[in-house]
Amino acid sequence: MKPGAFALNPHAASYVPISKRVDYGGGDDGLVFAAKSPTVEVSMPKKSSEMAYKQIRDDDLDLEMDIDMDIEYLLVTFSGLSQESITDVYLANGGDLEATIEMLNQLEIYSTESEENLPETLDIGDISESGPSTSKSTEVAASTSSVIPNAPVSA
């Protein structure tokens, strides 16, 4: 066996990495090894790219200031709500201030209507006055009171 030859295929050529292979379109296999390919660099003038970056940054800053001003306005207008809630509603509406105000107004209206239906106090011992559960609980109470005798307990 020749030195540097492979046991499985003694006629195989050495491996050439893909990055060093070049295809010229001519020849049998189309590859020429270890040839440098010409590189082309395209660049924009620095002044225009710097100006474009500054414009994008300024636009983002203006947008951020607009969002902050809208949220501050909403916080003042709807002082009973948290900043997180207002921000969530604002972002859910895609930054639309008018839609956010409308949604928060509806939230205030519905929250005051629901408070009117709440009882003054809530207690675990409160029994619902509606449905068949009331009649069952009164029947159970009546049956348990009649079963227990009033006999004196001796010590």
From Swiss-Prot:
Biased composition (Polar residues): 130-148
Signal peptide interval: none
Domain of life: Eukaryota
MF-aspect GO terms: ubiquitin binding
Motif extent (PAM2-like): 7-17
Residue segments, region Disordered: 114-155
Domain CUE intervals: 66-109
CDD domains xref list: CUE_CID7_like
Tissue spec. comment: Specifically expressed in immature siliques.
Miscellaneous comment in the UniProt entry for this protein: Overexpression of CID5/IPD1 leads to increased ploidy levels and longer hypocotyls in dark-grown seedlings compared to wild-type.
Domain notes: Contains a PAM2-like motif, which seems to be involved in the binding to the PABC/CTC domain of PAB proteins.
Biological function: Promotes polyploidy in dark-grown seedlings. Regulates the endocycle leading to hypocotyl elongation.
PANTHER family referenced in this protein's UniProt entry, alphabetically: POLYADENYLATE-BINDING PROTEIN-INTERACTING PROTEIN 5, POLYADENYLATE-BINDING PROTEIN-INTERACTING PROTEIN 6
Protein name: Polyadenylate-binding protein-interacting protein 5
